[in-house]
């Protein structure tokens, strides 16, 4: 789930295996450390944290922030054969590709991490202020159309969750209505 969300793989100079790296803003520092404690427990590797300054590159999404400097926390696991193995499944020509094989590797905690990295729970209210629906959106705009279709099919075939691809600027996001959002949340609790 981490690689589907806010983590990436990095191959260091003269390295044989890939390193897993995540970046989050200071508000998500505790969440970042929690994710890496899971990895440390399961992979037996230590990690290190660094505080960096980055420049906002998302000109198309947030034009007012282009070029602004901001603080990020970066955590690196170090190289590991498992990271290299998953990268071979997930990347084609150095681009993330979400295959059915990759999706079968997801666990409920992996889904939860992906949701916490790239998901959103929205509420719609009636005129009187009462909540009438809860909807989940999973931001999958960074994946190609085939990957997006694979994700929709995975949720339907595995959990009987009917997700829909909704237009978002020049791409699509996965949207779940109230019924399907409840199913999803029951899996990732």
Region locations from a protein language model:
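Internal intein/HINT superfamily modules and their associated LAGLIDADG
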Residues: 2-189
């Amino acid at each position: 789930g981490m690689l589907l969300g806010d983590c990436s793989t990095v191959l260091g100079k003269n390295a044989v295996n890939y390193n897993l790296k995540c970046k989050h803003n200071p508000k998500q520092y505790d969440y970042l450390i929690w994710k890496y404690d899971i990895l440390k427990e399961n992979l037996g590797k230590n990690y290190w944290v660094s505080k960096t300054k980055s420049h906002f590159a998302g000109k198309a999404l947030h034009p007012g922030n282009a070029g602004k400097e901001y603080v990020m926390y970066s955590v690196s696991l170090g190289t590991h054969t498992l990271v290299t193995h998953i990268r071979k499944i997930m990347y084609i020509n150095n681009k993330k590709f979400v295959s059915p094989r990759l999706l079968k590797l997801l666990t409920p905690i992996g889904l939860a991490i992906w949701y916490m990295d790239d998901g959103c729970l929205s509420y719609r209210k009636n005129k009187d202020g009462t909540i009438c629906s809860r909807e989940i959106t999973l931001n999958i705009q960074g994946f190609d159309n085939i990957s997006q279709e694979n994700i929709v099919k995975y949720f339907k075939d595995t959990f009987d969750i009917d997700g829909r691809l909704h237009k978002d600027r020049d791409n699509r996001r996965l949207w779940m209505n109230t019924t399907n959002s409840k199913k999803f949340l029951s899996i990732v609790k």
